[in-house]
Amino acid sequence: VVLGGELVEDPLLCLGIESTAHTIGVGIAASDGRILANENETYKPSRGGIHPREAAQHHASVAHIVLRRALNSAGISPREIDAVAFSVGPGLGPCLRTGATLARALALKFEKDLVPVNHGVAHIEIGRHVTGFKDPVVLYVAGGNTLVTTHHEGRFRILGETLDIAAGNCLDVFGIKAGIGPMPAPEDYARRGVQLHHIPLRVKGMDVSFSGVLTASERLLNEGKRLEDVALSVTEAVYSMLTEVLERAVALTEKREILLVGGLAKSRRLQQMVSEMAALHSAEFKPIPDEYLGDNGAMIAWTGIQMLRYGLTVRVEESFVKPKLRVDESEVPWID
């Protein structure tokens, strides 16, 4: 592998920094496949959703602690790292800039290559790594992203996506408005639900819309319906739409590996529905360990390793964050 103009023997070590939203994470990955460290701290507001500046301040205050924990966990010093990767986007601007600043400082101080990682691609890559899947159809569901994608001709192509809010955001907002808090609270309440109420499903081709689910949930709550039943109705509606568009993508591509990534992929009910759908199509589905589903530093480090092999680095003075970056805007040449 050529690194900084010199030929370097494997294994390479990459330190990855994740800071797109509520989580600041530092991971360390080796090119031989080992995840040496995965340390994370999450900003938890006292009420409501994420305030970008407050989250960024949280990240700045604990970044040195998370970094030290990761290095100690891996048993290495910063000088042993071959490159520093960071989440360049998509995400909240102030949070992204906090992680990028730390990455630039480390790259400059220790004279390491800097690798700008697409956060969405990283979710997929850590999923491919831990499952061993080669070319899956992917459902990426989180608080800020909802899309169906697969790799084709050098990058991930978006087959379908949300037309308004993300699935995770829909469930979080429902939980907050219902007074029970964001996920996983809505799913916890849903387990005690017994009656399904009608909620309109909005599926257009392989695109989905969740704003109507929120409107319907508010109506049901205002009508005095039992909270557990409303939670059951909302989660079933959201997961049914997601599974339907994923099934359409499987039928279209005729691929037989199914990957579920992102924070909302922790849902055991969603995993169950996807697993049942996969069986109908003789496709393989493997749930990913929770530690790699939410935002984490390990996924940035592992994707950084792949990018480093192909020379996909960036100069410090050109390492701008990209809050609106899409999954299909980044090159992914390491998948055949």
Annotated model-derived regions:
Residues 78-88, 254-264, 286-289:
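Short glycine-rich phosphate-binding loop at a beta-alpha junction
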Residues 77, 187-258, 265-281, 308-311, ...:
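A contiguous, well-structured pocket-lining segment that forms one wall/lid of small-molecule binding clefts
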Residues 80-125:
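Glycine-rich phosphate-binding loop and adjoining helix at the ATP-binding site
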Residues 117, 275-300:
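Conserved phosphate-binding/catalytic loops in two-lobed NTP-binding clefts
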Residues 288-330:
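Glycine-rich phosphate-binding/hydrolytic loop that grips phosphoryl groups
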